[in-house]
């Protein structure tokens, strides 16, 4: 059954493969993520205490200040950024952050990612061609 591909919309070009980390909560990169370590520091966030470094980060959309784009860039410079991002629908703050940081980003998948992805899955995000590919299923639970 694996691999499985789903088409989406390209926001930021490039390709990256990595382990999925899912949040149903929006993310504000300014104040919610430590730009030195990539650890989510927002206490009430579903990913509090977890690192986004090197992960394929799945979240619905961004929130908060426009400075969040530059925090994403700082994460990349500090080698603490996610490998790639999948959004339900990307807003401008996350789009700009991904583009200037060269983080592949795809949104608006033809199937809701929360229905088929779970923490620990291995996914390829192809931002250049606008698709994601589920390569390996992990041991985690789907986030419904």
Curated annotation (Swiss-Prot):
Heterodimer composed of a large subunit (PMDh-L) and a small subunit (PMDh-S). Keywords: Isoprene biosynthesis, Lyase. It is an enzyme of class 4 (lyase). Belongs to the AcnX type II small subunit family. One of its GO terms (molecular function) is hydro-lyase activity. Component of a hydro-lyase that catalyzes the dehydration of mevalonate 5-phosphate (MVA5P) to form trans-anhydromevalonate 5-phosphate (tAHMP). Involved in the archaeal mevalonate (MVA) pathway, which provides fundamental precursors for isoprenoid biosynthesis, such as isopentenyl diphosphate (IPP) and dimethylallyl diphosphate (DMAPP). One of its GO terms (biological process) is isopentenyl diphosphate biosynthetic process, mevalonate pathway. This is Phosphomevalonate dehydratase small subunit. The active site is at 65 (proton acceptor). It comes from the Archaea. It catalyses: (R)-5-phosphomevalonate = (2E)-3-methyl-5-phosphooxypent-2-enoate + H2O. Its EC number is 4.2.1.182. It comes from Methanosarcina mazei (strain ATCC BAA-159 / DSM 3647 / Goe1 / Go1 / JCM 11833 / OCM 88). InterPro entries: PMDh-S-like, PMDh-S-like_dom, PMDh_S. Pathway: Isoprenoid biosynthesis; isopentenyl diphosphate biosynthesis via mevalonate pathway.
């Amino acid at each position: 059954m694996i691999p499985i591909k789903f088409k989406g919309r390209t926001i930021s070009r490039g390709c990256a493969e990595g382990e999925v980390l899912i949040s149903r909560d929006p993310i504000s990169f300014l104040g919610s993520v430590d730009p030195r370590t990539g650890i989510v520091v927002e206490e009430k966030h579903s990913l509090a205490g977890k690192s986004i470094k090197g992960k394929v980060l799945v979240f619905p959309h961004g929130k908060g200040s426009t400075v969040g784009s530059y925090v994403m860039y700082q994460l990349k410079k500090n080698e603490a950024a996610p490998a790639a991002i999948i959004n339900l629908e990307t807003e401008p703050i996350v789009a700009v952050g991904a583009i200037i940081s060269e983080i592949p980003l795809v949104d608006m998948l033809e199937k809701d990612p929360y229905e088929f992805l779970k923490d620990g899955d291995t996914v390829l995000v192809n931002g250049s061609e606008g698709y994601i590919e589920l390569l390996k299923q992990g041991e985690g639970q789907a986030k419904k």
